[in-house]
Design a protein with these regions (language model features):
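Short, acidic/polar
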Residues: 21-34, 79-94, 115, 138-143, ...
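Conserved, mostly hydrophobic/aromatic
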Residues: 16, 33, 41, 53, ...
């Protein structure tokens, strides 16, 4: 497993995203992923699967300290009480006392960014989350967030067909990481002739080549 070192924390560079996984299929996918070596599981309140994720982790019988769990606060909960209660609910469903990383899932026009980040920092101090971050923040808003709190991550859509250089530049300035979602562009890479040719040359699939392209970049996870 490749790890990214951020703020003296070792974060697995490859994780299992659980968007669109529900119920028994989600539980089994999480348990199976852990059994073959995955150590980063990503979920969110909006996915409506935290309970199944928690059961999958329990079924895997892994030491909690050996697993990195990320969840996200939905944009309708971006208030002090919403974030506090939302994370408490997530922890209950996940059957854990803490997550490793809590993210603001999407920015909201009506959010008080300082209050949101202050609340996340308080929850961090209470041990409810080890690290804090954001998701789907454009470069300018990411810069503002970093000026207010020690956010370590921005989770955004990133793949060979979507340029995220502006976001990457901000992340690089502050030694933050990018976590890529939709890393294989919803399957588009599977039909990419250039990637198919490269795969034949190196004995790899287009998916493997794409994931390698992502994680070989500095402080990029997928």
């Amino acid at each position: 497993m490749i790890y990214i070192d951020i703020n003296q924390e070792k974060i697995p560079a490859l994780g299992l995203g659980t968007f669109n996984l529900k119920g028994e299929a989600c539980r089994d996918s999480v348990a199976d992923a852990i059994s073959i070596g995955y150590r980063h599981i990503d979920t969110a309140k909006m996915y409506e699967n935290e309970e199944a994720v928690g059961q999958g982790i329990k079924d895997a019988s892994i030491d909690r300290d050996n697993l990195f769990v990320t969840t996200k606060i939905w944009h309708t909960d971006l208030s002090r009480s919403g974030i506090t209660e939302g994370l408490a609910d997530s922890l209950h469903k996940l059957q854990t006392d803490y997550v490793n990383l809590a993210l603001i899932h999407w920015p909201s026009e009506n959010m008080d960014l300082r209050e949101c980040l202050d609340t996340l920092m308080e929850l961090q101090q209470q041990g409810k989350t080890q690290l804090i971050g954001v998701s789907n923040f454009p470069a300018a808003l990411l810069q503002e967030a970093r000026s207010l709190a020690p956010v370590i991550c921005n989770q955004v859509e990133y793949h060979p067909y979507l340029d995220q250089s502006a976001v990457l530049n901000v992340l690089g300035e502050h030694n933050m990481m990018l976590t890529a979602y939709c890393p294989i562009a919803k399957g588009e890479v599977l039909q990419d002739e250039q990637l198919i040719v490269l795969g034949e040359k190196y004995g790899k699939s287009p998916t493997q080549i794409t994931l390698r392209w992502l994680v070989q970049q500095e402080n990029v996870a997928a």
